[in-house]
Structures are given as structure tokens and as C-alpha cells.
């Protein structure tokens, strides 16, 4: 008789048909809330509808139901992303000069939008050369397509159709996993399985498949393109996969197949998996063979990482154990209890993810110019400026979002009775020390960084240049930054003797790389001017953090309002009889933090734009003489406030201000319109609610006189609604103004 151990029971992790699909339900506005579903009495109803539609916490307190809604919404989000991507690829296929650009990327500008002549606006179709007229694009899609080996508009069509299919699939998945097979709460909370799948699947296999695509498709096609072969003559992607000899002609090790891999003679593959460093002198981008090597290495790391956590087989790490083992001499219970927080509060989890992703996005912004990954990206100055600006703004918004959700967690999900002496509790108990020290740091940075500029403006005004802080008078060299630059420039000699250059040309030491008579990249010098503006960066970042962190740490209570947690995440004031308690809610801290985030990012993108035009971007003569766009004026002009106003804002705005009557006139209109949108925001930010309510009532009286009064009573915006509308227009107007200013400038001079 054979005695078997009992088979482990398979856990059923989904519920079948939990919520019936109902079109009637969808068609009823506010079906998620009893109050809103009754329909409008006053115009406040439409605001509440928008505020609460996606606030799943307010629909139900059942964590499983909330998790399912969030999960389903993610599929909807992915569907929109695929739809957007499909549109981008379709424009590339139908309305662009991609094939012409591919044949001569140094002289022909990328365009994927042609304006139809309806009321004379075909003036916007500028000459991008190569016999094509259209709007010059600065999204970097052409460069990505070339890097991935797309050689024809037909391939773009096929990809666009593929993305549409995926968009439909995602929509279906969103419906299916909410209405047909909805995961149980235990599935959402199984962090080890989630880690294994995301690490090994998404990041590991994702990187591996991309590395495979790069080796088998991108590398050979780009090799041909770099050699000047006509795109129409280049073999199609599937031919390299079916015919190994094609690849072996370009990369001899392919002839040996997998033998070197299994005999551990891996160096054989060094002809297509390289470690060179620096930039490809033909395209001004990173070596694609370096990039393929990088993705292969990343894939191996993540495939290993994806097998580290304990699931059904009782081996590996458990996340709870890891967290609870973290105890230092000064941290009490350490991370005890964090596991429970992060598996029961999606706001806490989201907050961490947003903080990480926001920081990562800003890192991406800096790498896109210092290590330009795609061919001909570095010499497309408009795209370089757009990519930097875009990733900086996105990073800023994500980091503010991190603070917002941390505060929502504190108000809605934090349970002080079960949290004693763990790290979070200890941070909350000495929050006064944290905030007051941070406040001191902000004051110090603000006065000193601004004071250096004011000193320079004063000395400049008095005609005493010898007494200014500058590279030619009193020097304040950024010695630590210069030391880091130097170390990185010299590092490959010691750490990677096989590499021909350092990770980035910006560190120094190397020569400049020029493509088609334009600078792709060169060593970036840092001096007194950078030292000054870096301290402005430090100041604005610290103030943003001060506002956001104060909002989180005082979200539940403060000396002023001890019962703040009962008032919720957003409230205007603590009742009419308590003066001086307005703008204290966690929501208001996010509101105020957004303005400082805007300040911080604005200074960064202004610094970048001017620094690159002054010290990096420009043309190279046949004799090798570099002429920068603004002739190196950053070091002497940006050391005074007046210099920033006169030589950056005013001098470089001439293109957008004078754009009327040219193909850039849309930027002139946007510049004007976005200024208006920004100014319009002030009407909401400085408004008094009572003033508008009085005005509304006299307008309603007039409507009643004429018997045209609506059934829904008009109401003035609440204090919070006014602030929300105000900050939205402030940011939208400011960002669109900057966008028009940057693009009109760089498309003209770049």
C-alpha cells in the first residue's frame, strides 16, 4: 500500500460573476452614491460628481471591492495608453515624412502632422526640408522607431493596428476582471507572488525580449542604415530570424550559434554585446550594441530577483520577515507593522510607488540628454529640450501625488491604536523637530541663495564687477560637483579597462561628438553660475518638501486642530466660530505644494535650456570650431537676476513674440492664450466666495424676471472648488506658456 501525503488544496482566488453588468446603472450619473444619484438640486452637484466618481473609498468601505475597482480601472488606463500609442504610430504611417527623415536625419526635420487649409491656417505647415511641409514634431518618436528597426510606413501601420487590438483587449480585461472573474482580496495581498511575477515577468522577460529584438532586428538594420544603405534595400525583420547567415555577415559570432554560450566562451559574443561607453560618432546616440548588452544584463538580474520570494514552495524570502528584521539602535520596533499597512492601505502603497516613480522620472530626464539613447536624438535640440521639460514636469507631479496619497493614508487608513513605537509612530512623535529644522533649512537656503544674486545685482548696478561672485572675480566654484565629474571621467580606466569612453561625455575628458555639423554632446563645464542656481534648486526643493511633509505629518492632528482626522482629507476651515483655521487640511497642503513644485521645476528647465544653448548646443565648422547658440553667455549673464530677465527670458522670447505670420505663429497664439489662462487662475485664487454668491443672486433675479430661470439653483464655487480650479489653470497656463516659449525659440535657432 502506497501512502501519499494529502494533495495541497488549490486555492480559488477569484469570485465568478460578482457584479452584474448593467447599462442602466452606467447611464445613471452618480450611481455610486445615494446622495448624488438623486440628481441635481444645485450646481454643486456636478462638482461632487467629479470629485467622488473615482474616490472608490467613498463608494464603499469593503477593501476587496475597492481593490477590484482599482484593478479594473488599471486595465482602462492601459487601454487608453494603447489607444494613444496607436494614434502616434498611425500619424507616423499616414501623415509623416518618416521615410524621408530616415534617409537623411541630419538635414530633414521630423513631422507627423499636416494642417488642412480651412481658414488659411496652412501657414503652420513649415518647410522641414526634403520637399515636405508640416508641423515639426519634438516627441522623439522618429528616433525611437529608427532605433527599434522600423524602416517603412507599412510597419508603422501594422504596429498601429496591433496597438488598437491590445487597447480592445485591455478594455475587455477591465470588464472581465470586475464583472466575470474578480480576484479575491487574498490575491491582491499576496505580495510575494506579485513580486515574483512583476520582477521575473514584466522586468525580466520584458527586458530579455527587448534585448532579443535589439540583437536580431535593431542591430542589423541600424548597421545597414548607418552604412548608408537605402531603407528599401535592407532585409525585413523576419529575414534575420529565419536566415542566420544574414546576421553572421554583420556579426561573425552568429555563425557559431549557441556553442560559445554553452561552452562558457562568452567573449565570442563581444561583436554584438559591447561595453564601449560614449556615443556612436555616426548617430550621436549610445552604441546600440551597448544598449542590447545592458538589457540582457538587466534581464538576468531581474529573472534572478523574480525567484527570491517565498510562495507555494516554502523557500525564499517572506516580505513580512524582511521588514520586521529591520531594527536599528534608535528605531524602537523598527518596521514592525509596515507590512500590514502596505497590504491594507493602497494609499500608503501608492504613495511609496509615486515617490519612487517620480524620482525615477526625473533621473530619466537627466539621462536623456547626458546619455542620449536613440540615434540622431542628441542633435535634435527641440526634442532634447521637450523630453527634458516633459520628464521634469511629470516627475514633479508624481512626487506631489506621493504626498497627497500619504496624507490620505494618514487620514483614512492609519490606526493609531495598533501603531506603537514603530518607525512611523516615532516619526510622528518628533514631527515638530523635523518640521522646524526643515523650516530653518529653507530659510537659510532662501536667504543665502537669493542673497548671492542680490549681491551680484547690486554690485553690477554700482559698476563694480570686480566685487561680484563670478568666474572672473570672486569665484565660488562647485568643487564637489567638479570632483564627481572628474572621477567619472577617469573611472573607466580603473573599473572598465575595455571601455573606450566614460558613461557620459558630459563628465569631461573626452572630445565632443558632432553629427552633421551640429554638436551632439561635449564635456559640460560647471562654474560659479551653476553654483548659484544649484542653491536656488536646493531652496525650492526644500520648500516643496516642507509644505508636503507638514501636510502628511499633521494630517490627523495639530496643536491648532487636535481633531483634524475627524474633519477628513479636505475641509475649508474648522467651523465658523474658530477663526484662523482655514487652509489647514491635508488637501490644502497639496494645493500649496503644487505651486512650489511649479517654482522648482521652472527654475530647473530654465537652467537646462539656457545652459545647453550657451555651453553645449551649436554648430561645428570644418576646422572644428564650435559656435554655441548663445555664445557661452550663461557663465557671466545668469549670475544676476537682471541677467536672467534680460538675457534669458526677454532675449529668448523674441522668437515666440515675433512668430506671427510665420509657420510658428501657433506658438505665438499659445503663448498669448496660455498667459490668459494663467491670469484667469488668479480670479479664482484671490476670490471671495460671498462676492460671487451675491452676484449670482442678482443674475438669478434677472432670469426669474424673464421667466428663464433653471430648475437647478446656481451656487458659487466652494472655497475648495475655487482653489482647485485656480491651481489647475495656474499650472496649465504656466506650463503651456513655457512650452510655447521653448519650442518657438529652439525650432528657430536649433
Curated annotation (Swiss-Prot):
Q: Name one Pfam family in it.
A: PsaA_PsaB
Query: What does the record note about the cofactor?
Result: P700 is a chlorophyll a/chlorophyll a' dimer, A0 is one or more chlorophyll a, A1 is one or both phylloquinones and FX is a shared 4Fe-4S iron-sulfur center.
Gene3D superfamilies (alphabetical) = Photosystem I PsaA/PsaB (1.20.1130.10)
Q: Where does [4Fe-4S] cluster bind?
A: 573, 582
Cellular compartments annotated: Plastid, Chloroplast thylakoid membrane
Q: What is its main location?
A: plastid
Question: Transmembrane ranges?
Answer: 70-93, 156-179, 195-219, 291-309, 346-369, 385-411, 433-455, 531-549, 589-610, 664-686, 724-744
Residues the record lists as binding chlorophyll a': 675
Q: Which domain of life, per UniProt?
A: Eukaryota
What positions does the entry give for phylloquinone binding? 692
Provide the topology term for how it sits in the membrane. Answer: Multi-pass membrane protein
Q: What class of enzyme is it?
A: oxidoreductase
Q: Which GO terms describe its molecular function?
A: 4 iron, 4 sulfur cluster binding; chlorophyll binding; electron transfer activity; magnesium ion binding; oxidoreductase activity
Tell me the residue numbers annotated for binding chlorophyll a.
683, 691
Which reaction equations make up its catalytic activity? reduced [plastocyanin] + hnu + oxidized [2Fe-2S]-[ferredoxin] = oxidized [plastocyanin] + reduced [2Fe-2S]-[ferredoxin]
Which terms under GO biological process does the entry name?
photosynthesis
Annotated EC: 1.97.1.12
A Gene Ontology cellular component where this protein is annotated is: photosystem I
Keywords attached to this Swiss-Prot or TrEMBL record, sorted alphabetically, are:
4Fe-4S, Chlorophyll, Chloroplast, Chromophore, Electron transport, Iron, Iron-sulfur, Magnesium, Membrane, Metal-binding, Oxidoreductase, Photosynthesis, Photosystem I, Plastid, Thylakoid, Transmembrane, Transmembrane helix, Transport
Entry similarity comment: Belongs to the PsaA/PsaB family.
User: HAMAP family per the record?
Assistant: PSI_PsaA
Instruction: Describe its assembly.
Output: The PsaA/B heterodimer binds the P700 chlorophyll special pair and subsequent electron acceptors. PSI consists of a core antenna complex that captures photons, and an electron transfer chain that converts photonic excitation into a charge separation. The eukaryotic PSI reaction center is composed of at least 11 subunits.
| Purpose | PsaA and PsaB bind P700, the primary electron donor of photosystem I (PSI), as well as the electron acceptors A0, A1 and FX. PSI is a plastocyanin-ferredoxin oxidoreductase, converting photonic excitation into a charge separation, which transfers an electron from the donor P700 chlorophyll pair to the spectroscopically characterized acceptors A0, A1, FX, FA and FB in turn. Oxidized P700 is reduced on the lumenal side of the thylakoid membrane by plastocyanin.
The name this protein goes by in its record: Photosystem I P700 chlorophyll a apoprotein A1
Source organism:
Atropa belladonna (Belladonna)
- Output the lineage of the source organism: Eukaryota, Viridiplantae, Streptophyta, Embryophyta, Tracheophyta
Record gene name: psaA
Amino acid at each position: 500500500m502506497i501512502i501519499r501525503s494529502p494533495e495541497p488544496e488549490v486555492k480559488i482566488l477569484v469570485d465568478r460573476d460578482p457584479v452584474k453588468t448593467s447599462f442602466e446603472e452606467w447611464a445613471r450619473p452618480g450611481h455610486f452614491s445615494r446622495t448624488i444619484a438623486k440628481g441635481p438640486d444645485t450646481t454643486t452637484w456636478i462638482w461632487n460628481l467629479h470629485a467622488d466618481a473615482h474616490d472608490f473609498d467613498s463608494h464603499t468601505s469593503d477593501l476587496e471591492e475597492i481593490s477590484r475597482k482599482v484593478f479594473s480601472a488599471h486595465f482602462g488606463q492601459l487601454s487608453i495608453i494603447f489607444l494613444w500609442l496607436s494614434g502616434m504610430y498611425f500619424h507616423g504611417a499616414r501623415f509623416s515624412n518618416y521615410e524621408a527623415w530616415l534617409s537623411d536625419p541630419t538635414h530633414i526635420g521630423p513631422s507627423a502632422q499636416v494642417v488642412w487649409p480651412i481658414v488659411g491656417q496652412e501657414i503652420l505647415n513649415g518647410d522641414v526640408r526634403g520637399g515636405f511641409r508640416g508641423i515639426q514634431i519634438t516627441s522623439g518618436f522618429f528616433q525611437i522607431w529608427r532605433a527599434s528597426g522600423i524602416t517603412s510606413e507599412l510597419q508603422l501601420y501594422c504596429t498601429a493596428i496591433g496597438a488598437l487590438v491590445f487597447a480592445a483587449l485591455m478594455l475587455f480585461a477591465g470588464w472581465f476582471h470586475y464583472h466575470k472573474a474578480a480576484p479575491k482580496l487574498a490575491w491582491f495581498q499576496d505580495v510575494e507572488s506579485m513580486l515574483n511575477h512583476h520582477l521575473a515577468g514584466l522586468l525580466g522577460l520584458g527586458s530579455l525580449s527587448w534585448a532579443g529584438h535589439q540583437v536580431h532586428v535593431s542591430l542589423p538594420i541600424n548597421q545597414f542604415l548607418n552604412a548608408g544603405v537605402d531603407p528599401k534595400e535592407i532585409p525585413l525583420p523576419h529575414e534575420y530570424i529565419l536566415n542566420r547567415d544574414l546576421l553572421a555577415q554583420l556579426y561573425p559570432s552568429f555563425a557559431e550559434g549557441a556553442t560559445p554560450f554553452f561552452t562558457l566562451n562568452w567573449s565570442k559574443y563581444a561583436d554584438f554585446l559591447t561595453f564601449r561607453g560614449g556615443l556612436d560618432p555616426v548617430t550621436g546616440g549610445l552604441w546600440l550594441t551597448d544598449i542590447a548588452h545592458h538589457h540582457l544584463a538587466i534581464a538576468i538580474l531581474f529573472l534572478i530577483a523574480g525567484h527570491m520570494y517565498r510562495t507555494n514552495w516554502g523557500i525564499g524570502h517572506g516580505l513580512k520577515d524582511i521588514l520586521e528584521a529591520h531594527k536599528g539602535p534608535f528605531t524602537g520596533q523598527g518596521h514592525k507593522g509596515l507590512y500590514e499597512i502596505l497590504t491594507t492601505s493602497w494609499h500608503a502603497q501608492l504613495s511609496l510607488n509615486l515617490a519612487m516613480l517620480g524620482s525615477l522620472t526625473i533621473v530619466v530626464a537627466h539621462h536623456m540628454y547626458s546619455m542620449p539613447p536613440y540615434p540622431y536624438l542628441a542633435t535634435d535640440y527641440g526634442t532634447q529640450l521637450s523630453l527634458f521639460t516633459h520628464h521634469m514636469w511629470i516627475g514633479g507631479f508624481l512626487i506631489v501625488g506621493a504626498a497627497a496619497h500619504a496624507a490620505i493614508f494618514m487620514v483614512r487608513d492609519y490606526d493609531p491604536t495598533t501603531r506603537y513605537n514603530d518607525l512611523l509612530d516615532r516619526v510622528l512623535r518628533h514631527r515638530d523637530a523635523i518640521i522646524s529644522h526643515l523650516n530653518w533649512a529653507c530659510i537659510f537656503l532662501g536667504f543665502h541663495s537669493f542673497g548671492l544674486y542680490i549681491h551680484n545685482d547690486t554690485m553690477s548696478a554700482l559698476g563694480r564687477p570686480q566685487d561680484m561672485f563670478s568666474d572672473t572675480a570672486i569665484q565660488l566654484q562647485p568643487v564637489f560637483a567638479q570632483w564627481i565629474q572628474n572621477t567619472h571621467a577617469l573611472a573607466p580606466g580603473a573599473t572598465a579597462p575595455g571601455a573606450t569612453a566614460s558613461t557620459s561625455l558630459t563628465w569631461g575628458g573626452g572630445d565632443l561628438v558632432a553629427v552633421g555639423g551640429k554638436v551632439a554632446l561635449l564635456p559640460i563645464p560647471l562654474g560659479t553660475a551653476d553654483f548659484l542656481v544649484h542653491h536656488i534648486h536646493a531652496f525650492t526643493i526644500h520648500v516643496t518638501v516642507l509644505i508636503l511633509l507638514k501636510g502628511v505629518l499633521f494630517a490627523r492632528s495639530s496643536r491648532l486642530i487636535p481633531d483634524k482626522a475627524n474633519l477628513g482629507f479636505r475641509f475649508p476651515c474648522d467651523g465658523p466660530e474658530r477663526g484662523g483655521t482655514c487652509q489647514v487640511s491635508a488637501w490644502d497642503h497639496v494645493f500649496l505644494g503644487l505651486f512650489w513644485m511649479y517654482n522648482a521645476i521652472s527654475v530647473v528647465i530654465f537652467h537646462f535650456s539656457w545652459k545647453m544653448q550657451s555651453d553645449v548646443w551649436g554648430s561645428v565648422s570644418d576646422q572644428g570650431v564650435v559656435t554655441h547658440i548663445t555664445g557661452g553667455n550663461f557663465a557671466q549673464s545668469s549670475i544676476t537676476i537682471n541677467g536672467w530677465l534680460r538675457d534669458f527670458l526677454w532675449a529668448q522670447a523674441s522668437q515666440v513674440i515675433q512668430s506671427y505670420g510665420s509657420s510658428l505663429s501657433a506658438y505665438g497664439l499659445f503663448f498669448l492664450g496660455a498667459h490668459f489662462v494663467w491670469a484667469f487662475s488668479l480670479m479664482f485664487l484671490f476670490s471671495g466666495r460671498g462676492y460671487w454668491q451675491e452676484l449670482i443672486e442678482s443674475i438669478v433675479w434677472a432670469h426669474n424676471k424673464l421667466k428663464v430661470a433653471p430648475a437647478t439653483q446656481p451656487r458659487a464655487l466652494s472655497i475648495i472648488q475655487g482653489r482647485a480650479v485656480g491651481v489647475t489653470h495656474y499650472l496649465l497656463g504656466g506650463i503651456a506658456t513655457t512650452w510655447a516659449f521653448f519650442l518657438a525659440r529652439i525650432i528657430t535657432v536649433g
